[in-house]
């Protein structure tokens, strides 16, 4: 950042050479430059993948420590619909349901870790998680692991499934069936 900041200050000085710049005007010009820099980096990150507002805020704060322009950039991105936790949570759940064997509890926890508000998490879970698909995922994981016959193996498999975010009720239902 230091090299870029010095280059920007030199450009500002060259552009306004011979003019008297007040400290306030100089700060406004520099702030506008920082805003553009942060905005561009935000778009670069969002082009790679969708982010929650919290995730993007963390990345920008880490990269642009002490810059107060981070929050205005995030607000502008939200206004322009480039950044939206509702859309992020729906896409996240849809993607994980298609590509991972995770249950609703794990999905909820992952979204909470990404700073998504509870209302968007619940909306995404309700609209994208189908109990019959969860059941099929649990059954597939049980088949893959081999149906446990002894109680210790059943407990171990149940714990594994629980860590993946499946409900205890669903796990018990599948494990209490005859082997598939």
Spans of model-derived segments:
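Short Lys/Arg-rich amphipathic alpha-helical segments
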Residues: 13-35, 39
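Short capping segments at the starts of secondary-structure elements
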Residues: 46-53
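Short helix-coil junctions and helix-kink-helix linkers
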Residues: 59-66
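Strongly charged, low-complexity linkers/loops
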Residues: 85-163, 170-180
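Short amphipathic alpha-helical interaction segments
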Residues: 66-73
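Single conserved hydrophobic/aromatic residue that forms the stacking wall/gate
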Residues: 1-4, 8-12
């Amino acid at each position: 950042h230091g090299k870029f900041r010095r280059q920007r200050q030199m450009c500002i000085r060259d552009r306004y050479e011979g003019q008297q710049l007040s400290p306030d005007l100089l700060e406004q010009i520099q702030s506008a430059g920082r805003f553009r820099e942060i905005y561009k980096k935000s778009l670069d990150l969002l082009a790679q993948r969708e982010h929650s507002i919290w995730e993007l805020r963390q990345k920008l704060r880490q990269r642009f420590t002490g810059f107060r322009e981070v929050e205005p950039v995030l607000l502008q991105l939200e206004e322009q619909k480039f950044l939206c936790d509702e859309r992020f949570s729906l896409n996240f759940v849809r993607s994980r349901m298609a590509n991972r064997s995770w249950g609703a509890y794990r999905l909820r926890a992952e979204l909470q870790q990404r700073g998504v508000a509870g209302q968007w998490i619940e909306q995404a879970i309700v609209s994208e998680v189908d109990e019959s698909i969860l059941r099929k995922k649990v059954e597939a994981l049980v088949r893959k692991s081999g149906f446990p016959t002894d109680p210790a193996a059943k407990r171990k498999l149940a714990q594994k499934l629980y860590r993946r975010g499946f409900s205890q009720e669903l796990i018990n239902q599948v494990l209490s069936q005859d082997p598939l």
